[in-house]
A protein has these predicted regions:
Chain B
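Conserved ABC ATPase signature
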Residues: 131-135
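Helix-to-loop junction immediately C-terminal to a conserved catalytic motif
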Residues: 48
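ABC ATPase C-loop
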Residues: 148-149
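Conserved catalytic motifs of ABC-family nucleotide-binding domains
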Residues: 152
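ABC-type ATPase nucleotide-binding domains, specifically the catalytic core motifs of the NBD
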Residues: 12, 68, 93-111, 120-122, ...
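The feature captures the beta-strand-to-loop junction immediately N-terminal to the Walker
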Residues: 33-35
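Conserved ABC transporter NBD signature motif
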Residues: 56-64, 76, 109-114, 216
Length: 288, 234
């Protein structure tokens, strides 16, 4: 078996995994600042992907251009949804808020199905067939762009959390909510911004991966599951864990699809997760 | 001046606090003492806006605190150092202090505040880059108080600062607390250690099962038998 091909599979897996990591990071940020499990997380990614499709169909926008529209759009959607719907339910009971995200999952699926039909679709990009040579390995344009963008955004997020006032407020809220309130941190505002940010990350990931991953109205739940698995894999309250988990997930998934086919390949990442949790119940980087 | 009047709070059937009244004058240190579960921490939560009373009033000078959000109450200069420290464990000492100074009044004076608290607690400057969760109990308490001071408090609410500390550390910390009134800070001290609390305050209130059963000048209260019964660390 050709080692080059194996390395290529690994490389592509890691590159895509970086973006999965960002998607999961958004979900983790929402979880640690609000305690809410966003069941509709993957659905919003699907929304972003379909937005890219529409922008292509209507205006021939390349997905890499659509990103500049989908990111602010998803942020605003997230902000409004949290501010007017989720937050009120959170005040009542966290389970009600979780329930509403579950509801959003089905609503989004139905709406997407009505507008776009049930077929699997993907969006082409001008750099779709361009190749970059890294030594003996070949990487196609979309994979490289996705990885580079994910890396840059990852670093920016790190700087946001470490160096800015807002970032400090988020970390404080994560570590001790009561103390954060006593410092004068506006918990509701911070949570709203984090929710918007989580969805903005989906607005980024959607168009970037749509040249590589096809979309149908029903992928929402699948993406949510992936993001959730990565979150748990990395240690549920650990942000770095989500990134590392994403990379590992991309790797395992890519290798799984290379060596196995169809249904068995889909089982590989789940099996890996179960294995890791058996050995380290807190996740890879979580607390024991 | 902080004035709590006839405040009742907690569950309808069995309120945690019943018709509690107390006041804290400007530049004064007053203490609220009593056994565990008597309702002392609930009082702190009420003043800080984390809880609402079912009846009664809480006034800071001319402003009513009831219904204000916790962040508005912090903006007014009423700062709580909560029970159990509640530091941000994975953030450094310096970051914890920085977070203390984030309210609008305190922010412009951040640099000066750092100098002040490092002068009061030099060990914190030494350990500036250390994660707060790795400090010893006494150092954590110092950091918690310092973090409260960074917020430029007019009123400092101290909830059980002596818990888990050795008598020597308690004495050291209480000495610092006593000196705060000279800086124009009024201190409301909630404590189980009655002796230490009365020694550092000018007025005291004894809480028993949700009611104020005794109040007066600290030097007078020391003699009361009810207080003597409740002596901890005595």
């Amino acid at each position: 078996m050709d080692l080059t091909i194996l390395l290529q599979v690994i490389l592509q897996g890691l590159m895509l995994g970086a973006m999965y990591g960002l998607v999961s990071l958004g979900m983790t940020l929402i979880f640690v600042t609000t305690g809410l499990m966003n069941f509709a997380h993957g659905s919003f990614m699907a929304v972003a992907m379909y937005l890219a499709l529409s922008l292509f169909t209507a205006f021939h926008f390349d997905p890499y251009v659509s990103v500049f529209i989908t990111v602010p759009t998803l942020f605003i959607i997230g902000w409004i949804l949290f501010r007017f719907v989720v937050r009120r339910l959170l005040e009542v009971h966290i389970l009600m808020a979780a329930q509403v995200t579950l509801g959003m999952l089905w609503v989004i699926e139905s709406v997407l199905s009505t507008i776009y039909g049930n077929n699997i679709q993907s969006v082409p990009t001008v750099i779709g067939s361009s190749k970059v040579y890294l030594g003996p390995l070949v990487v196609t344009g979309p994979y490289l762009v996705t990885f580079v963008v994910a890396a840059i955004v990852g670093v920016l997020l790190f700087l946001l959390l470490q160096k800015t006032d807002f970032g400090r407020s988020v970390r404080a809220l994560m570590q001790d909510r009561k103390a954060a309130e006593l410092m004068g941190i506006r918990v509701d505002r911070t949570q709203t911004a984090v929710f918007g940010l989580g969805l903005a990350l989906l607005g980024l990931a959607g168009p970037l991966v749509v040249p590589m991953i096809s979309v149908s109205p029903f992928v929402g739940l699948q993406f949510t599951l992936f993001a959730f698995m990565i979150m748990v894999f990395g240690g549920s309250s650990n942000l770095l864990g989500s990134v590392v988990g994403g990379l590992m997930f991309g790797l395992v998934d890519s290798l799984g699809r290379f060596f196995f086919t169809g249904n068995i390949a889909s089982l590989i990442p789940f099996s890996a997760l179960v294995l890791v949790l058996l050995l380290r119940p807190g996740g890879l980087l979580g607390e024991k | 001046m902080l004035k709590v009047e006839n405040v009742t709070a907690g569950y309808l059937q069995s309120p945690v606090l019943r018709e509690v009244s107390l006041q804290l004058e400007d530049n004064e240190c007053a203490c609220v003492v009593g056994a565990n579960g008597a309702g002392k921490s609930t009082l702190m939560s009420l003043i800080s806006g984390l809880m609402r009373p079912s009846s009664g009033s809480i006034m800071f000078n001319e402003t009513s605190l009831i219904g204000l959000s916790p962040s508005k109450i912090v903006d007014l200069g009423i700062i709580q150092v909560p029970e159990g420290r509640r530091l941000f464990p994975r953030m450094t000492v310096a970051e914890n202090l920085l977070l203390g100074a984030r309210n609008a009044r305190a922010r412009p004076e951040t640099k000066a505040s750092f100098e002040k608290v490092y002068h009061l607690f030099p060990i914190l400057e030494e350990r500036g880059k250390q994660k707060a969760g790795t400090l010893s109990g006494g150092q954590q308490q110092m950091l918690a108080i310092a973090r409260g001071l960074m917020a430029k408090p007019k009123v400092l609410l101290l909830d059980e600062p002596s818990i888990g500390l050795s008598p020597i550390l308690v004495a050291e910390i209480f000495k610092t607390v006593g000196g705060l009134v000279n800086d124009g800070i009024s201190v409301l001290l909630v404590e189980q250690n009655v002796r230490a609390a009365l020694a550092v305050s000018s007025h005291g209130f004894l809480v028993e099962r949700g009611r104020i059963v005794l109040s007066g000048k600290s030097q007078d209260l020391v003699e009361e038998s009810a207080i003597k019964r409740g002596f901890i660390g005595g």
